Design a protein with these regions (language model features):
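Serine-hydrolase catalytic core recognition
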Residues: 105-107, 112-264
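Short coil/loop residues immediately preceding or within conserved phosphate-binding loops
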Residues: 18, 27, 39, 88-91, ...
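Multi-bladed beta-propeller domains
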Residues: 1-19, 45-72, 81-83, 96-113, ...
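C-terminal, active-site-flanking charged/polar segments
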Residues: 51, 68, 93, 222-225, ...
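Secondary-structure transition/capping motifs at alpha-helix termini
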Residues: 36-37, 45-53, 85, 174, ...
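Short glycine/proline-enriched, acidic/aromatic patches that form the donor-sugar handling elements
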Residues: 85-88, 241-243
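Beta-strand C-termini and the immediately following turn/loop, strongest in propeller blades
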Residues: 21-37, 70, 77-87, 125-131, ...
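Structural motif
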Residues: 39-43, 87-92, 133-138
Length: 266
């Protein structure tokens, strides 16, 4: 039996890193992920008829991955991006009720959060960082209250050994409206009075951007190694790559040779 069907003219995404569908046989419902309003959001449907009961999340931001569903309390724990101020590729943990009420960010600390939870989700740890700020691990409870700082990475030795901090930036895309984000790497001997060739590290494709993950990394690919050869190295998540709105992702659908990266980066 076919309960529900969604058809799109371009890509269909069921989530960012995996499928966000869930079936709840006890209550005769299912959770559906859709980008039909241009952003990836969650919807609750009747399992028998397929009819929409209610939209759970909404707005100009996206649900990334459903991590846990509590069918007793009717709460959904999920990661999202673009709702908090700043870089839309930063990942935060949220909790929301099945009916769409009670949406709360459980990890408001700025950065990309990696979550590990107890089986009952009464407690969890979050390790968060940015491209320039090293990881901090916190222990929190189900309500998002911080119980303890578990660990803070010390990068003093990196700094003593001339580690170079990447520079996060945003510029307007090809339409002069959309903000696109990237990282810039300078050689350790950089002199603002000198000219340097620019190496644009392009990875075009609808499945991934050039950066994607803006968490802390001692060495992201060979970006800094190339910079040390005398280049200014940049990587940009251009229009046509995932992790943003559907229209952003669809920017060069069906025309990969056009490589959106070139249109946004030149």
């Amino acid at each position: 039996k076919s309960v529900y069907k969604e058809v799109t003219k371009t890509y269909y995404e069921s989530g960012v890193n995996g499928e966000n569908w869930r079936v709840f046989f006890k209550t005769n419902e299912f959770l559906w992920y859709s980008e039909k309003d241009d952003w990836g959001h969650l919807y609750l449907h009747d399992l028998t008829t397929g009819k929409l009961k209610n939209q759970i999340t909404s707005g100009e931001w996206l649900v990334r991955d459903v991590l846990h569903v509590d069918e007793v309390t009717r709460e959904i724990f999920f990661t999202g991006g673009g709702k908090e101020e700043g870089n839309p590729y930063h990942v935060y943990l949220y909790k929301v009720n099945f009916d769409g009420s009670g949406l709360i960010c459980l990890t408001p600390e700025k950065g990309t959060h990696s979550i590990n939870a107890s089986n009952d989700w009464e407690y969890f740890t979050t390790t968060y960082s940015t491209s320039k700020n090293p990881p901090i691990t916190l222990l929190k409870n189900r309500s998002g209250e911080t119980l303890k700082e578990v660990n803070k990475v010390d990068i003093s030795e990196l700094l003593k050994n001339n580690w170079q901090e990447p520079i996060e930036f945003s510029v307007k895309g090809r339409d002069d409206i959309t903000d696109i984000y990237g990282l810039l790497y300078l050689p350790s001997f950089y002199n603002e009075n000198h000219n340097y060739p620019v190496l644009n590290y392009i990875y075009p494709g609808p499945q991934s951007g050039s950066i994607g993950n803006y968490s802390f990394s001692v060495a992201k690919r060979d970006f800094q190694a190339l910079a040390e050869l005398g280049f200014i190295v940049i990587g940009v998540d251009a229009m046509g790559t995932p992790g943003r709105s559907k229209s952003f992702h669809d920017a060069y659908y069906g025309c990969l040779l056009y490589t959106s990266d070139a249109a946004d980066e030149i």
